[in-house]
Amino acid sequence: EAAGVRVGGIALAVPGPVDAERSRVIRPARMPGWDGINVAEAITEQCGLPALIENDARAGAIGESVYRRRLQGVTPIDTLIYVKAGSAIGGAYLVDGVPQVGQGGLAGDISHIPVEAAAGRPCKCGNVGCLETIASADSIRADLAASGLVYENNAQLLAAARDGIPEVATAIRQAGTLLGHCVAHLVSFLAPEGVIVGGALSAVDAFTAGVRAALHQSCLPSIMEH
């Protein structure tokens, strides 16, 4: 207000399945206490401003699509698969810039796709063998701790990656490779204009290199050429 700017509303990106039409979080594995809560209503009650919520990966996908349209000399990508790779894994799919939400807003959540490499690993969702248990920053840190390399948080893990610690770089690239092979199935089925990886791990070259190599290895050349 002091700067002469009026806040018109609040938008909140939530790390879990979201029914945006009803402004409710749906059984979030990492935030069980939020299940069924009308978050937008709670924000409005506290702040007196209109509010809306969206899944964080879906919001990231929309942001990437809109941002690229505003950049000169950059080809817009409006039909895309977006993967958020950070402490957890998330995903979204846009067609012509419109997020595909699916029944109840649950579309795009690739984190709990079962993958063979994760067989037997328990996931916070209650299942075993989910992608998130082998491709997220939390899972990388847990695996390194089991081998004697302990990092207190993911910020320390990423700092070690930037410092070029070989064991960390290897573990992060492996996670990127496993994620890439999973995403390759989606690319082959949906044939999007592009795949965008966001989240904290996307800033690590070893991770994105693993994703890219897996996509080229697992997808038809004709799809990758486009």
Predicted regions span which residues?
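ATP-binding/phosphotransfer module of carbohydrate and carboxylate kinases, centering on a glycine-rich
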Residues: E1-G8, E21, E45-L49, R68-I77, ...
